[in-house]
């Protein structure tokens, strides 16, 4: 195998590892985000765990974060919570940074 092939394989492995790490970080972010939203919605005990699962599943529907934003925004609206889309997006960013620290 040539050094070019070795280098190519190394880059492919790094890319795969980076993608796996991003997936794990987003999973942790979604858990933190789900806990925050559940608290704001007044969920208790098992309702919190169930809601976290709903949030995690919502993120798997479409690429990007808008599916999470829409889901939580609709839930807040249904419960008459006054939390803006900007605050929701800000929390996603905050929890992403927190989750990154978990993997350092």
Each language-model region and where it sits:
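A charge-rich, low-complexity, intrinsically flexible signal that marks solvent-exposed coils, linkers
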Residues: 1-104
């Amino acid at each position: 195998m040539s050094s070019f092939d070795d280098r190519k394989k190394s880059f492919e492995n790094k890319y795969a590892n980076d993608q796996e790490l991003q997936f794990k970080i987003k999973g942790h972010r979604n858990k933190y985000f789900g806990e925050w939203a559940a608290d704001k919605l007044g969920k208790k005990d098992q309702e919190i765990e169930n809601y976290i699962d709903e949030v995690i599943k919502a993120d798997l529907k479409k690429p990007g974060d808008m599916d999470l934003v829409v889901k939580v925004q609709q839930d807040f609206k249904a419960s008459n919570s006054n939390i803006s889309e900007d605050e929701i997006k800000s929390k996603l960013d905050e929890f992403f940074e927190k989750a990154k620290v978990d993997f350092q």
